[in-house]
From Swiss-Prot:
Record carries keyword Chloroplast: no
InterPro entries: Cortactin-Actin_Reg (IPR050719), Cortactin-binding_p2_N (IPR019131)
Name this protein carries in UniProt: CTTNBP2 N-terminal-like protein
Main location: other
Amino acid sequence: MNLEKLSKPELLTLFSILEGELEARDLVIEALKAQHRDTFIEERYGKYNISDPLMALQRDFETLKEKNDGEKQPVCTNPLSILKVVMKQCKNMQERMLSQLAAAESRHRKVILDLEEERQRHAQDTAEGDDVTYMLEKERERLTQQLEFEKSQVKKFEKEQKKLSSQLEEERSRHKQLSSMLVLECKKATNKAAEEGQKAGELSLKLEKEKSRVSKLEEELAAERKRGLQTEAQVEKQLSEFDIEREQLRAKLNREENRTKTLKEEMESLKKIVKDLEASHQHSSPNEQLKKPVTVSKGTATEPLMLMSVFCQTESFPAERTHGSNIAKMTNTGLPGPATPAYSYAKTNGHCDPEIQTTRELTAGNNVENQVPPREKSVALAQEKPVENGGCPVGIETPVPMPSPLPSSGSSLSPSSTASSSLTSSPCSSPVLTKRLLGSSASSPGYQSSYQVGINQRFHAARHKFQSQADQDQQASGLQSPPSRDLSPTLIDNSAAKQLARNTVTQVLSRFTSQQGPIKPVSPNSSPFGTDYRNLANTANPRGDTSHSPTPGKVSSPLSPLSPGIKSPTIPRAERGNPPPIPPKKPGLTPSPSATTPLTKTHSQAASLTTAEDLASSCSSNTVVANGKDVELLLPTSS
């Protein structure tokens, strides 16, 4: 098949077939991702079991030990492999575009050759004009001779016409006699025709009676058929309503099951936390008050060492609130509290609660007034402080002793680099990469090579491009209702494919620049990739973030193509209360293929959405304060 000679309808048909194949490929990819969730988690987290809190503690211990003993094989996959895949895809696209460009150039050359031939032909026509006039003169002379010959022929024909006219008169007389005879025969035939007409009238009356009876029977048959179609349509409408209600109830049941599952897991984690808190309070001794403090740059004051242990992959927000209120009471009443709190934060990915962190700063401010450690020890301990799982990156600076304590309202973190914030907000960031990034930023902050400058220029160009596209998508989605899952057979919007490509390139660029790019201060309201999609997702969902339990409106699957915190643009009619539209009924006793296709699609979409909810139930969303803004992180919980 020659692609250059295809017509417009054939090209449209070919494009529609290719688009259908692409959509089918995307569906197959999503199904395979949903099936290989366990293998994906095994590749991502290596040998550790994420459902066991003891294994999580062992992982953290090995991470801390790895800093002193030497480098080990990282747990996460190498982001360079992802970058190589992206570069390979770009090369394939470049080759394809080059082939299309070559085809366009060949067509262009062909058109140019055709135009050149037309110009040469026109030049030949103008050159042959004189020859044409000469030929016309010759033709004129020939025609004049032929005209004279035709005149002589006309004279001959006139003579023959006179002879024929005389013969015609004789024939006319004979025809008159024959016509008189024919008139008599015609009168006889008219009489017979009148008799036959009377007979035909009688037969037509009988035919009209039979037709009227047949029309009545047809009307009765049509009425019966219409009643049958109406009853069939009502039955199909009821069946479709029952199917829709069944899917809605099934989705609601799945959501309730996921919610009860997460609540049970949180209850178990809360019980474990309460037991551990009681055990830690019993084993705590007064000697713990003499521990060495660690100074961390928060405003202009120092604070003691605050260790955060990742006890479980779920968090206990009410317990932390209660303990934070107890510490606040101890600070307000002036009672001497312990220098290092005995409780451990059960946080996922190193998430720091702002209210608890403010209370911790108040306690640290009161302790700084009583005991001021030596400068060398505070600096040494500040450099050895780990960043837990890439959460709450705090810039380490030289402590400045201040006589006044911290104000109760001032809870600000020192600004970190753009690379560290992007690494922290990345869903596949590891504590090893975070510590290496902080160490490199502290050791050589002013180093910047020409290669890194080129990378940063490309990074900012991609950033401005995605920012303009995100603004357009935001304006288009602002006119719609709040996003949630849809169970009706609706078409998938192409913005999901755009968002998938945008997030893939954004994650690759963020990882690449977080390892090699220089450190730059970032304003609190800015995002390293233009528009902050996580904040947009938070504004789209006005519910508070006080509850860290995964809910269907906030938790996204780790296998989702969208970035963390961004939900699908589809809107569920099940949550709005409006049922999806009933497929149009076509006349006929058998159901048409177009009426059965949406129902099949609805079942497949419901199954895929149920799988997505199961994946979403195994994740918990947290908020990490990085560069003065909230960043949502997702981690699978114990299942």
